[in-house]
């Protein structure tokens, strides 16, 4: 292959450095499936495996204690690959965009306001050294909507003393209207694998993909019969068909004439809107954003101001943290038109009206897969 062509191909890549498995294998796997326009290779989603405060220390070890000075050029792909894959070093020149996604983790023993503030300040441009997206209090905050629409999201916060992190995860598990939908593909695979012993990976994946692409509830029986033809004969096949039909009905996507991916894409657009509104409220005291102001409001968000306010509000044991997910902003950052395609712009009365059709009233979202 021509060396120049190979270099162009490598430079067109986007690198995503995340904290843990959930970010890569649940959230961003799903986002990339729902928004293929992002064109990010899952191989370029690197799991760092520890928190932002350890990341700060690793950068300091590599570049010295004055690494935060403006003239120090930080090569994050090198820092991470040197630690995780020393036999396969990578450099920032290999990538066009570098994105970091980490949790706020106020509860962590090594929490440091100065360290996280410096990380937010230094990593503000994905086309240069990288851009940091902080989730408050943790990555699971993107799931922390109780209904769609959720009028209370504006004021959703957690006490500083809600520690350790697994307590927040448990709270989200109990309250989230989003979580059952996020895990639906994984639960579907587990059902076929562990409960019905469909161990052939190719057959199982084909079945899951077909089911996730259903969009017509009226012909559900015929479609399921076609899918199950590929499964070896088993006396439990009839039971499996009825269980799948129930799950698909509760997941609600086919009821709306959408595939699972279309349904989740629309749901993510709503999640993004709610979090843009929340970030705007934290920063400027303005929550409900009208359609004509949506892009401007998003582009005026300042992660440094938001972090500073979160630090001040959570400074004592009596304090609190606003629930906010900024990692979903990656979609809007890539191409804002992707979040404008739902309804008008998924804002105001339009969001309220369309939201009621999917996740409120009949309990489908709350009880999906129950």
Language model feature labels by segment:
Residues 2-11, 25, 29-46, 56-60, ...:
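C-terminal accessory helical subdomains adjacent to catalytic cores in phosphodiester-
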Residues 20-24:
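Short acidic, Gly/Ser-rich segments with clustered Asp/Glu that frequently serve as metal-coordination loops
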Residues 51-78:
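Charged, often glycine-rich, active-site loop that binds/positions anionic groups
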Residues 14-17:
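Conserved beta-strand elements of the Class I
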């Amino acid at each position: 292959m021509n060396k120049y062509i190979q270099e162009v191909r490598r430079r067109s890549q986007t690198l995503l450095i995340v904290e843990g498995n959930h970010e890569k294998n649940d959230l961003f796997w799903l986002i990339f499936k729902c928004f293929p326009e992002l064109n990010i290779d899952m191989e370029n989603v690197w799991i760092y495996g520890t928190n932002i405060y350890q990341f700060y220390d690793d950068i300091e070890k590599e570049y010295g204690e004055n690494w935060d000075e403006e003239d120090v050029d930080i090569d994050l792909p090198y820092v991470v690959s040197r630690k995780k894959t020393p036999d396969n070093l990578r450099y920032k020149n290999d990538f066009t965009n570098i994105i970091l996604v980490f949790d706020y983790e106020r509860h962590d023993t090594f929490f440091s306001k100065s360290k996280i503030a410096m990380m937010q300040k230094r990593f503000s441009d994905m086309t240069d050294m990288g851009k940091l997206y902080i989730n408050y209090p943790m990555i699971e905050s993107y799931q922390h909507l109780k209904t769609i629409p959720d009028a209370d999201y504006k004021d959703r916060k957690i006490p500083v003393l809600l520690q350790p992190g697994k307590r927040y995860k448990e709270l989200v598990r109990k309250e989230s209207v989003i979580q059952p939908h996020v895990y639906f593909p994984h639960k579907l695979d587990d059902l076929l694998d562990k409960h019905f012993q469909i161990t052939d990976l190719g057959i199982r994946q084909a079945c899951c993909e077909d089911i996730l692409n259903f969009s017509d509830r009226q012909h559900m029986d015929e479609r399921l019969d076609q899918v199950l033809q590929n499964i070896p004969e088993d006396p439990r096949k009839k039971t499996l068909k009825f269980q799948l039909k129930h799950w698909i009905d509760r997941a609600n996507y086919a009821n709306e004439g959408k595939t699972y991916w279309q349904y989740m894409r629309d749901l993510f657009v709503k999640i993004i809107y709610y979090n843009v509104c929340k970030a705007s409220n934290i920063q400027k005291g303005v929550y409900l954003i009208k359609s004509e102001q949506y892009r401007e409001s998003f582009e005026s968000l300042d992660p440094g101001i938001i972090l500073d306010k979160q630090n001040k509000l959570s400074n004592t044991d009596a304090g609190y943290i606003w629930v906010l997910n900024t990692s979903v902003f990656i979609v809007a950052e890539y191409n804002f038109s992707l979040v404008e395609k739902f309804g008008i712009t998924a804002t105001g009365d339009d969001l309220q009206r369309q939201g009621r059709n999917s996740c409120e009233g009949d309990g489908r979202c709350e009880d999906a897969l129950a």
